[in-house]
Regions:
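Conserved, well-structured core segments
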Residues: 269, 333-336, 368, 382-384
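Metal-assisted phosphate- and nucleotidyl-transfer catalytic regions
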Residues: 295-344
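Flexible, glycine/threonine-enriched loop-and-boundary segments that flank and lead into catalytic domains
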Residues: 147-182, 316-322, 336-373
Length: 421
């Protein structure tokens, strides 16, 4: 690209391989620039890029680079590539705004999804002005999420070395949680969604608030009711649930073919009723919301929505036995929900838990390690694994897959030290 026109391509390749981040490599290797310390203001940069025809943008970017120092070039590459990200969750950013402004984080979240960037009305309110006058009837409601049950049962330092038997895990459950306080249901292998319908319109949201309705017109067309339902988006295969791979073929599409609509019909397995008509039910206990949901479905019989059944159990041993069959039943595991819990956005501790099936394991050999990208660019964090098999000349290693996630920062540091040793 641009940098390879200014520096030796092989030098750029080697530098990128060492640094691991494209923006950082370009910002550091670009020759000269920014000598007078007068980088162009952001508004001028945006105006220049907007005004430039597509065929001339490379020249405009190069001219901007020449006026910038390494820090400004780094920011510009990140902005242009859409990669200006930091390791901060949206929830944490909203929590910080709440602490700074004194406004409730729950209200900030609700207004957030009813407004559009750059959120001028929201920031005026946070600075002491009037609350934005916005219709939230069709807006996304921040979802309630669950903690892994292991995170609750074990201290953080114990989790990595946790090799307890199922009986020992049940004993911990019994010591910390009363089964009578919880309802259980299957954790379905789909996509968590929120379906909202009012006189104003209809919307289908992902767990992060993204509007995925255009990919599922069959669902939107069937939402002839008013309210807000929380559930799992699934694809039907006759009377059964199709594998997740079938649902993936319908995700992230702006248009859907008639063939997909016919062969991969979508439906929602409902977990919770957040609004019944205009009535907000989120402050009610889960047991009461669940009863309202069951009655709502029985009365209205909404097309493409069914009820996620409760899993009856009389103790942790019985529930552990059910969980052991989750893989054969094509389930991800179980969900545990306190019967007295209100619906609270975010991930409050102690109210909802997910008890996923145990992962399968395989004995593999680490054969390659590669530097990562971004914040992991200084670590060997991308690993290739192989298994032994019988070859023409005896046993041989055959690569079977790569992994670059699923480990903690401490484990990453340990693996990096092992690779470098």
């Amino acid at each position: 690209g641009l940098a390879e026109e200014r520096v030796d391509p092989e030098l750029f390749r080697l530098s990128y391989d060492f640094v691991g981040d494209l923006a950082e490599t370009v910002s550091l290797i670009w020759p000269g620039g920014g000598a007078d310390g007068r980088a162009p203001p952001l508004g001028e940069v945006v105006d220049a890029l907007r005004a430039a025809p597509r065929s001339d943008r490379a020249r405009v970017v190069a001219a901007l680079f020449d006026r910038m120092g390494p820090s400004e070039r780094f920011a510009l590459v990140k902005l242009c590539a859409g990669g200006l990200r930091v390791g901060v969750s949206a929830r944490l950013a909203k929590t910080a705004l709440a602490e700074w402004s004194g406004r409730p984080v729950e209200r900030i979240e609700e207004l957030w999804f009813g407004l559009e960037p750059p959120f001028e009305a929201l920031f005026r309110w946070l600075e002491g002005g009037c609350e934005p006058d916005v219709d939230l009837s069709l807006a996304f409601r921040p979802m309630m999420l669950a903690h892994p049950v292991e995170q609750y049962l074990y201290a953080a330092e114990e989790q990595r070395e946790n090799r307890e038997t199922e009986a020992e895990t049940r004993a911990r459950l019994a010591a910390k949680l009363d089964p009578a306080d919880f309802a259980a249901e299957w954790k379905w292998d789909g996509v968590r969604v929120q379906a909202a319908a009012t006189a104003k319109g209809r919307a289908l949201y992902s767990r992060t608030g993204e509007d995925i309705g255009p990919a599922f017109p069959d669902l939107l067309g069937a939402m002839d009711w008013e309210g807000c339902v929380d559930g799992e988006l699934l694809v039907a295969a006759g009377d059964a649930v199709a594998p997740f791979s079938e649902l993936q073929r319908r995700l992230n599409r702006k248009t859907v073919s008639a063939k997909d609509l016919a062969e991969r019909p979508a439906f929602i397995r409902a977990y919770d009723l957040l609004h019944d008509g205009r009535e907000d039910l989120r402050a009610l206990p889960f047991a009461e919301r669940r009863a309202r949901l069951a009655a709502w479905i029985a009365e209205r019989r909404p097309a493409r929505i069914d009820l996620s059944p409760e899993v009856a159990f009389d103790g942790w041993r019985a529930l552990a036995d059910l969980r052991a069959g989750a893989r054969d039943a094509a389930q991800e595991g179980l969900m545990l929900k306190r019967r007295d819990a209100p619906y609270v956005g975010g991930r409050p501790m102690g109210l909802w838990f997910k008890w996923k099936r145990d992962p399968l394991s395989a004995d593999c050999v680490l054969v390659y390690a590669q530097r990562g990208h971004g914040k992991r660019s200084s670590y060997y964090s991308d690993y290739t694994f192989a298994c032994w098999r019988e070859g023409a000349e005896g046993p041989e290693l055959t690569p079977v897959g790569k992994a670059y996630s699923g480990f903690t920062d401490a484990e990453l540091a340990e693996l990096d030290r092992f690779v470098r040793a």
